[in-house]
UniProtKB/Swiss-Prot annotation:
pH dependence of this protein's activity: Optimum pH is 7.0.
Task performed by this protein: Acts as a phosphosugar phosphatase on a broad range of sugar phosphate substrates with preferential activity on D-ribose-5-phosphate, 2-deoxy-D-ribose-5-phosphate, 2-deoxy-D-glucose-6-phosphate, and D-mannose-6-phosphate and with a lower activity on D-fructose-1-phosphate, D-glucose-6-phosphate, DL-glycerol-3-phosphate, and D-fructose-6-phosphate.
Similarity comment text for this entry: Belongs to the HAD-like hydrolase superfamily. DOG/GPP family.
Cofactor(s) demanded: Mg(2+)
Family matches, as CDD domains: HAD_BPGM-like (cd07505)
UniProt entry tagged with the keyword Metal-binding: yes
Class in the EC hierarchy, top level: hydrolase
InterPro entries recorded: Beta-PGM-like, HAD-like_sf, HAD-SF_hydro_IA, HAD_2, HAD_sf, PGP-like_dom2
Protein species of origin: Arabidopsis thaliana
Tissue expr: Ubiquitous with highest expression in flowers.
Stated name of the protein: Haloacid dehalogenase-like hydrolase domain-containing protein Sgpp
EC number(s) recorded for this UniProt protein: 3.1.3.-
């Protein structure tokens, strides 16, 4: 979204040395691999305005961040259509179709992501995508970013008993990859996602692509970065290299 950058000033030199030797890295998809939240917002604004939601006034970024970002469509349907959830789910399907149409032309990786994927591959670390996004969205974004062969597993919230913020999707990723939470790192950009990773027992690095740092810190990430080119991240990875 805006690339919120009011990063927590007290965290000047974070360390994740307790993860050494690192076994795996888990990534959310929306807002974590790419800055896709602005496209979700456009799709929601367009379709909600068509049906006269909020008296025809487009929802703003604040409403989106506080009520929609990072949430599963079942939650969003209930929020937008509390008296007719089946209509809400149908609306969400229509919104996802519009999103896929727009995102296919606009998607690009966050700064530093390709460098990080090479770092991960060079060290033979296991990796998975863990997302609340619908399957079609996740597959499209991962494919358009050129990461289909990079990820060894894609865990969908809809295929778990509960989606994020429940820890289930991240626990399933650990099981599928056969790695331990004590040696696995998570990247997330939403409160819902950070809560899920933390509840699963792993340190989570939060990205401020779509949410203010002050909001993300409530979910207790290890620390925050603006993107994968952030020197703070590479200092942590270098320390992990030296400890392994």
């Amino acid at each position: 979204m805006n690339g919120f950058s009011d990063l927590n000033p007290s965290e000047s030199k974070p360390s994740l040395s307790q993860l050494a030797p690192l076994e795996a890295i888990l990534f959310d998809v929306d807002g974590t691999l790419c800055d896709s939240d602005p496209i979700h917002l456009i799709a929601f604004q367009e379709l909600l305005q068509e049906i006269g939601f909020n008296n025809g006034v487009p929802i703003d970024e604040k409403f989106f961040v506080e009520n929609i970002a990072g949430k599963h469509n079942s939650e969003i349907a209930l929020l937008l259509f509390p008296d007719d959830v089946s209509r809400g789910l149908k609306f969400c399907d229509e919104k996802e179709a519009l999103y896929r149409k727009i995102v296919a032309e606009k998607i690009k990786p966050l700064d530093g992501l390709i460098k990080l994927t090479k770092w991960i591959e060079d060290r033979g670390l296991k990796r998975a995508a863990v997302t609340n996004a619908p399957k079609e969205n996740a597959e499209l974004m991962i494919s358009k970013l050129g990461l289909t062969d990079f990820f060894q597993a894609v865990i969908l919230g809809s295929e778990c008993e509960f989606p994020k913020p429940h820890p289930g999707p991240y626990l399933k990723a650990l099981e599928v990859l056969n790695v331990s939470k004590e040696h696995t790192l998570v990247f997330e950009d939403s409160i819902s996602g950070i809560k899920a990773g933390v509840a699963a027992g792993m340190p989570v690095i939060g990205l401020t692509t779509g949410n203010p740092a002050s909001l993300l810190m409530q979910a207790k990430p290890a620390f925050l970065i603006e993107n994968y080119a952030d020197p703070k991240l590479w200092a942590v990875l270098e320390e992990l290299d030296n400890k392994s």
